[in-house]
């Protein structure tokens, strides 16, 4: 019995470590793009990253892998992808690249009537206000969405990216 408990514990810790590595590699891969989008649109980099991580399971969901859709955005007509050699029809939007998906999320936040008030009311430092505002404006049906996104931000300290300068060379020029 002790051996079984030990094996289960080892497997569980391996899975947690694997998920952590997936999250960290996703952040590393897309943080600079999220920072650029923040400086162009005012949507916090932490919100862009955490929402993408949450909605796409760090890029591992079917729609993230097959459609480059990191945010679960619907629209764009009928799209298709293949799963187990079968054609699957979907209402989710297809993007040419992950970056196009990130950019579209920021465009949705800044141009759609239900969300654009957030850029007027909040700074890119107020990630808590953004998460709650996005949820209250109808982005998702889950009443836990903001809390889940905020948990990701806190767990990985994504709010530190909201402090990043527009020009990455400024980081080296202004050491702290």
How should each PLM-predicted stretch be described?
Residues 4-14:
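Sec-dependent N-terminal signal peptides
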Residues 16-176:
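Catalytic cores of secreted/periplasmic lytic hydrolases that degrade extracellular macromolecules
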């Amino acid at each position: 019995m002790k051996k079984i408990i030990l094996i289960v514990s080892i497997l569980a810790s391996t899975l947690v470590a694997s998920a952590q590595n997936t999250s960290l590699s996703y952040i590393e891969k897309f943080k600079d793009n999220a920072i650029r989008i923040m400086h162009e649109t005012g949507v916090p980099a932490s919100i862009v990253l955490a929402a993408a991580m949450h909605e796409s399971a760090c890029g591992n969901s079917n729609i993230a892998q097959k459609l480059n859709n990191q945010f679960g955005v619907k629209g764009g007509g009928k799209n298709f992808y293949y799963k187990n050699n079968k054609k699957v029809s979907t209402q989710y939007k297809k993007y040419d690249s992950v970056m196009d998906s990130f950019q579209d999320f920021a465009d949705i936040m800044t141009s759609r009537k239900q969300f654009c008030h957030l850029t007027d009311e909040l700074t890119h430092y107020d990630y808590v206000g953004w998460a709650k505002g996005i949820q209250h404006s109808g982005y998702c049906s889950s009443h836990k969405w903001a809390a889940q996104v905020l948990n990701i931000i806190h767990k990985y300290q994504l709010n530190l990216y909201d402090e990043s300068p527009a020009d990455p060379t400024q980081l080296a020029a202004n050491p702290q």
